[in-house]
């Protein structure tokens, strides 16, 4: 699933090529991708100018004028691609937006879990998913993020994945930041010192920034707005490396299910508190 860095990279690429352009037509090839009446979606979007493209958490948001927003929740396999000319739909193309300059935007989604909406300002602000999002981890300090979870008895990895606690963090960047800060994914936040929590969020911020610089992580499906793969997967220290030696101490990485997600960690470098 594309996480904060991947969606940020996509939004920057799309903004560069699409802001200021006008949507001429909408072709919906899979109605289940549009989480509202398809005819309302089409009528709202056609003829509107793209004024801004940005990200909130894992959402890609395309502003149309002052009071309309196309939101793309990419889920597992969603992609949004910009083309300079018309595009021939592929088997997994779900929506095609035609532009007045002859270009096109393609929403591609192999597994059909992605969700697309066209919402006005009021609808966006009242959408439960959107209004319950926590702070952006790159827009507040590590100290502020630490304060949000100090004393909570939940497992630290579950808190990192909780979008109401910190927006945009997923499995990849949770594992990477926990390893780099020496914290076991099953540790309870209440058992961690403020110093440890600040270090965790400092590492999370560093990992997210590095991933954005390296164009995101491509494991299976992710590509940027131009169709290019990311490179941060080559910088993984722990994610997906169960059974391999820890680069810091040589002990074999272990795996466990934490907060319903597969986790990889080093039991030597990330010790549980006795």
Curated annotation (Swiss-Prot):
It catalyses: Hydrolysis of DNA containing ring-opened 7-methylguanine residues, releasing 2,6-diamino-4-hydroxy-5-(N-methyl)formamidopyrimidine; 2'-deoxyribonucleotide-(2'-deoxyribose 5'-phosphate)-2'-deoxyribonucleotide-DNA = a 3'-end 2'-deoxyribonucleotide-(2,3-dehydro-2,3-deoxyribose 5'-phosphate)-DNA + a 5'-end 5'-phospho-2'-deoxyribonucleoside-DNA + H(+). GO terms for biological process: base-excision repair. The active site is at residues 2-3, 58, 261. Its EC number is 3.2.2.23, 4.2.99.18. The keyword Ligase does not apply. Its cofactor is Zn(2+). Keywords: DNA damage, DNA repair, DNA-binding, Glycosidase, Hydrolase, Lyase, Metal-binding, Multifunctional enzyme, Zinc, Zinc-finger. Binds 1 zinc ion per subunit. Disulfide bonds: none annotated. DNA binds at residues 92, 111, 152. A zinc finger (FPG-type) spans 237-271. CDD domains: EcFpg-like_N (cd08966). Pfam families: Fapy_DNA_glyco, H2TH, zf-FPG_IleRS. The keyword Transferase does not apply. One of its GO terms (molecular function) is zinc ion binding. Monomer. Belongs to the FPG family. Involved in base excision repair of DNA damaged by oxidation or by mutagenic agents. Acts as a DNA glycosylase that recognizes and removes damaged bases. Has a preference for oxidized purines, such as 7,8-dihydro-8-oxoguanine (8-oxoG). Has AP (apurinic/apyrimidinic) lyase activity and introduces nicks in the DNA strand. Cleaves the DNA backbone by beta-delta elimination to generate a single-strand break at the site of the removed base with both 3'- and 5'-phosphates. This is Formamidopyrimidine-DNA glycosylase. The gene is mutM.
């Amino acid at each position: 699933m594309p996480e904060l860095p991947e969606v940020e990279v996509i939004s920057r690429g799309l903004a560069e090529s699409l802001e200021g352009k006008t949507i001429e037509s909408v072709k919906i090839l899979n109605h289940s991708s549009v989480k509202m009446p398809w005819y309302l979606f089409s009528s709202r979007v056609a003829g509107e100018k793209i004024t801004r493209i940005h990200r909130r958490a894992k959402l890609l948001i395309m502003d149309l004028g002052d009071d309309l927003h196309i939101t793309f929740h990419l889920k597992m396999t969603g992609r949004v691609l910009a083309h300079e000319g018309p595009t021939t739909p592929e088997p997994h193309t779900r929506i095609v937006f035609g532009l007045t300059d002859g270009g096109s935007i393609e929403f591609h989604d192999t597994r059909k879990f992605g969700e697309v909406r066209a919402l006005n300002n009021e609808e966006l602000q009242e959408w439960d998913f959107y209004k319950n999002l926590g702070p952006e981890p790159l827009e507040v300090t590590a100290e502020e993020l630490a304060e949000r979870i100090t004393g909570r008895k939940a497992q630290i990895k579950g808190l990192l994945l909780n979008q109401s606690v910190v927006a945009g963090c997923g499995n990849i960047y949770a594992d990477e930041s926990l390893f780099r800060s020496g914290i076991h994914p099953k540790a309870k936040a209440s058992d961690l010192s403020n110093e440890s929590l600040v270090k965790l969020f400092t590492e999370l911020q560093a990992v997210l920034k590095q991933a954005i610089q390296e164009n995101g992580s491509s494991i299976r499906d992710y590509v940027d707005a131009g169709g290019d793969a990311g490179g941060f997967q080559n910088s993984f220290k722990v994610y997906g490396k169960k059974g391999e030696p820890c680069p810091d101490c040589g002990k074999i990485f272990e795996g466990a299910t934490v907060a319903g997600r597969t986790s990889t960690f080093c039991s030597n470098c990330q010790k549980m508190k006795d």
